[in-house]
């Protein structure tokens, strides 16, 4: 009896072990994602990056079938949040919104991070810099303004953001590219486009570089006019405003942009799944209406295209930052 009992116990153990072995492939092959995702936003709540990130998270979770929790990781001029994305476990469960500043921070000596430290998923937003002047300005084209700066270096002042911000670099880069000197129009720092535009209307500065949308109310009121946009094509809502290339022949472009990325080394399956879901989100009526209603520019560049975009943006920003003495 004792021997029979031992054999029965052995048979039961073997059966359980076999069941475990058979169950293992099923567990290993479970479809991604199996649990909630985290989307890191490297800027504060209430801003444009936060707003677009939260909209994406809400729609993305419907496509992925798992919650996508937004976490704001702020500080260090964007370094804290961008670092958190890059150093997260590359398992496909932590992604984030990366912004144009990833191509600025390392040039400024704030971090060693570059776009190569991420798995690029998709670029979804692009707001080209516009050249805004007073409505009664004698300058009718971007070429007129550039010629005036060349003839009178240091006379005309620009504004639109803080020193070294994206709109400052847009103006400095355009002037540098045109041979007018990156500092041909001295920069007056402001706490954003809105106060810069008010200073423009008041006569304290002569030009403001910002997105055209940020100047739209003053343009509609007949107090400001936009001479050109530093983008690939004209803006749908401001089709009368030419591109810088159309206005001057220059290939210089500069824009604020946002995209979704994860840490380098993410599994291909997770990257492909998120990318496909994000494309559905981007094309949805809800997302398109949200972006257009708030004046955010729309662009779609997945994977490798986004990686190339980041490389080109980094190179352009580095050139300007070196020219104006902001690179470390």
PLM regions and their residue ranges:
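C-terminal lobe and pocket-closing loops
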Residues: 126, 214-283, 312-315, 320
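Hinge/capping helix and adjacent helix->loop/strand transition within the periplasmic-binding protein
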Residues: 84-93, 107-195, 244-246, 257-290
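N-terminal (or domain-start) structured segment
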Residues: 29-117, 155, 180-207, 298-301, ...
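An extracytoplasmic/periplasmic, membrane-proximal ligand-sensing/linker region
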Residues: 34-36, 268-328
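N-terminal signal peptide c-region/cleavage motif recognized by signal peptidases
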Residues: 25-27
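Conserved hydrophobic residues forming the short capping helix/wall of the S-adenosyl-L-methionine
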Residues: 57-61, 175, 219
């Amino acid at each position: 009896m004792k021997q029979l009992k031992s054999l029965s116990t052995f048979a039961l153990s073997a059966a359980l072990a076999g069941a475990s072995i058979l169950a293992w492939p099923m567990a290993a092959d479970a479809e991604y994602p199996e649990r909630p995702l985290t989307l890191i936003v490297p800027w504060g709540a209430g801003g444009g990056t936060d707003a677009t990130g939260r909209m994406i998270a809400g729609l993305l979770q419907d496509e992925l079938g798992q919650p996508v929790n937004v976490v704001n990781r702020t500080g260090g001029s964007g370094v804290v949040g961008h670092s958190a994305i890059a150093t997260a476990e590359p398992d496909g469960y932590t992604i984030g919104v990366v912004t144009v500043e990833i191509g600025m921070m390392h040039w400024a000596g704030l971090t060693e991070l570059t776009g190569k430290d991420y798995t690029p998923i998709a670029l979804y937003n692009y707001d080209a810099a516009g050249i805004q002047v007073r409505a009664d300005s004698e300058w009718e084209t971007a070429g007129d303004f550039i010629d005036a700066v060349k003839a009178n270096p240091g006379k005309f002042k620009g504004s639109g953001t803080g020193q070294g911000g994206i709109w400052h670099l847009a103006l400095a880069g355009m002037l540098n590219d045109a041979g007018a000197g990156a500092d041909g129009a001295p920069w007056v720092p402001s706490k954003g486009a809105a106060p810069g535009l008010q200073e423009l209307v008041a006569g304290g500065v002569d030009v403001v570089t910002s997105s055209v949308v940020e100047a739209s109310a003053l343009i509609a009121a007949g107090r400001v006019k936009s001479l050109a946009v530093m983008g690939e094509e004209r803006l749908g809502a401001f089709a009368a405003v030419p591109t810088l290339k159309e206005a001057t022949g220059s290939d210089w472009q500069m824009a604020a942009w946002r995209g979704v990325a994860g840490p380098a080394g993410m599994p291909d399956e997770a990257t492909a799944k998120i990318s496909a879901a994000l494309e559905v989100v981007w094309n949805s009526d809800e997302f398109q209406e949200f972006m257009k209603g708030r004046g955010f520019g729309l662009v779609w560049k997945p994977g490798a295209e986004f990686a190339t975009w980041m490389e080109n943006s980094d190179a352009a920003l580095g050139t300007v930052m070196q020219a104006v003495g902001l690179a470390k």
